[in-house]
Each structure stands twice: as C-alpha cells, then as structure tokens.
C-alpha cells in the first residue's frame, strides 16, 4: 500500500503509509488522529491557538491528535469546513 490523498470538506490531506501500518481495528482511530492533526497544521496554528480559535479544551484536541479519544465524524467535517472557509476568506 502506498500514500494516498484523502479529501474532507474540500481539504486534501496526504495520508502517509506509516499512518496505516497498524492493525485494521486500530487503523480508523489512527487515521482520524492523523486527519485532525493535518487539518490543524494546514491552519498554521499550534494546538493552543487552534483550541482557542475553536473554543475547544486543549486536552480534548490533544487526545484526538494522539488517538486516545475518538471524535465524532461530523466534528471532524465541521472543523475542516471552518478551516477551509477561513483560508478561502484570507483570515488564516
């Protein structure tokens, strides 16, 4: 298996092979953690600034990015949408 592009709410995220090298049952959690981290990185913010911007507790985002907690799919899509719209408007 090789790297591939995942598109979520108009944002293209490169998924590297190393993010997929775990068991299938663990893969969904790892991918979700990978996606939220890449979305934050595309916003150009660190965790603290990203949390303040979204109104999220820091520990929640940290747990999502580390795969210690599962976020609802709709939350991932809403965050991706907000980042995409703010970038398009030139505010990020």
Predicted regions and their residues:
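DNA major-groove recognition helix of helix-turn-helix/homeodomain DNA-binding modules
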Residues: 70-92
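Short basic helix-loop element that most often maps to the first helix and adjoining turn
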Residues: 35-49, 78
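A secondary-structure capping/hinge motif
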Residues: 60, 69-70
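N-terminal flexible/basic segments that precede or flank functional cores
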Residues: 1-30, 85-92
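Positions in alpha-helical segments
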Residues: 34, 38, 59-62
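Short alpha-helical DNA-recognition segment
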Residues: 44-62
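Secretory-pathway ectodomains
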Residues: 35-36, 54-55, 82-83
